[in-house]
């Protein structure tokens, strides 16, 4: 399923409008802007499961150049803010309220978008890589309007989930620590096991609908 996308629809997104990315490097990590060329195809949104059982990939393209921020690890794209991230996080942004925990920092897209919500009181981010945190704190976090809501914890997500999450009474917990379904399914299933430690929290997971297409 192909989608012809409008550049202006995404450039008007608050993150794209307000967060300006400059090239930077810390350790093995590089912060930079990448480009989709006109008519270059890319993954756009979760897999779509049809009524007849078919599973259809959703592919997007722009008719003009589109610039997006990225973090590369050893020159491999690892963390991006493309239309795919924008679309696949919409539901988790809409559902977030109160005291939020998110596993995985990336470029701070999810943290930024929910920090802009009046009904979100705090955003705790658990990230295991110190260099990713350093890039974010130096170049991105200072641009947040509500950075006073943000708390970053340098820890492995699974260690935090097993040992600390039950002490905090989070209202909403969002997990985004995988690159795609290839590395994500096992981590998704493992993280689901920890839900019982904070039973009053609402849980959501990045690209969960896509992963369920492979699991079910």
Describe each PLM feature range.
Residues 1-97:
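Class I S-adenosylmethionine
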Residues 1-27, 84-95, 99-216:
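The AdoMet/dcAdoMet-binding core of the Class I SAM-like
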């Amino acid at each position: 399923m192909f989608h012809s996308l409008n550049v202006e629809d995404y450039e008007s997104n608050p993150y794209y409008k307000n967060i300006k990315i400059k090239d930077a490097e810390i350790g093995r990590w590089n912060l930079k802007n990448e480009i989709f060329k006109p008519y270059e195809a890319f993954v756009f949104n979760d897999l779509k499961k049809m009524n007849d059982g078919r599973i259809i990939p959703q592919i997007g393209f722009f008719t003009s150049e589109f610039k997006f921020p990225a973090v590369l690890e050893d020159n491999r794209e690892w963390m991006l803010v493309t239309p795919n991230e924008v679309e696949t996080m919409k539901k988790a942004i809409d559902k977030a309220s109160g005291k939020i925990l998110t596993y995985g920092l990336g470029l701070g897209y999810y943290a930024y978008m929910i920090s802009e919500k009046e009904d979100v009181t705090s955003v705790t981010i658990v990230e295991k890589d110190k260099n990713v945190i350093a890039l974010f704190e130096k170049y991105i976090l200072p641009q947040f309007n509500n950075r006073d809501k943000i708390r970053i914890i340098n820890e492995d997500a699974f260690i935090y989930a097993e040992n600390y999450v039950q002490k905090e009474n989070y209202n909403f917990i969002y997990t985004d620590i995988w690159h795609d379904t290839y590395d994500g399914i096992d981590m998704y299933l493992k993280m689901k096991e920890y839900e019982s430690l904070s039973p009053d929290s609402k849980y959501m997971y990045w690209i969960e609908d896509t992963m369920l297409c492979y699991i079910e």
